[in-house]
Amino acid sequence: MPRSLKKGPFIDLHLLKKVEKAVESGDKKPLKTWSRRSMIIPTMIGLTIAVHNGRQHVPVFVTEEMIGHKLGEFAPTRTYRGHAADKKAKKR
């Protein structure tokens, strides 16, 4: 169930301060964050945010289409290596 519109988007305050500081100074360095639950807001457009996936920080360049999504959606936490091949099918 989506978040109520009357509540507004959730964004951690420490991340919001980092974003405002980066926009104000025009700094293009990636912003490191562990806050995967924060929603992408319009002031983040054009910034690179390094989102933690449990092992490393994944750089995410924020575009206009990402507004309203959460940062964690763009930093996958699991690696899929494929299913084991069926040995019987290979012999044929």
UniProtKB/Swiss-Prot annotation:
- Look up the domain of life of the source: Bacteria
- Listed GO CC annotations: cytoplasm; small ribosomal subunit
What keywords are assigned to this protein? Ribonucleoprotein, Ribosomal protein, RNA-binding, rRNA-binding
Classification via InterPro entries: Ribosomal_uS19, Ribosomal_uS19_bac-type, Ribosomal_uS19_CS, Ribosomal_uS19_SF
Q: Which GO terms describe its molecular function?
A: rRNA binding; structural constituent of ribosome
**Pfam families listed in its UniProt record:** Ribosomal_S19 (PF00203)
GO terms, biological process: ribosomal small subunit assembly; translation
Keyword Ribonucleoprotein attributed: yes
Please explain the role this protein plays, according to its UniProt record.
Answer: Protein S19 forms a complex with S13 that binds strongly to the 16S ribosomal RNA.
Q: Which family does it belong to?
A: Belongs to the universal ribosomal protein uS19 family.
Instruction: Please identify the protein, giving its name as recorded.
Output: Small ribosomal subunit protein uS19
Q: Which organism is it from?
A: Vibrio vulnificus (strain YJ016)
GN (gene name): rpsS
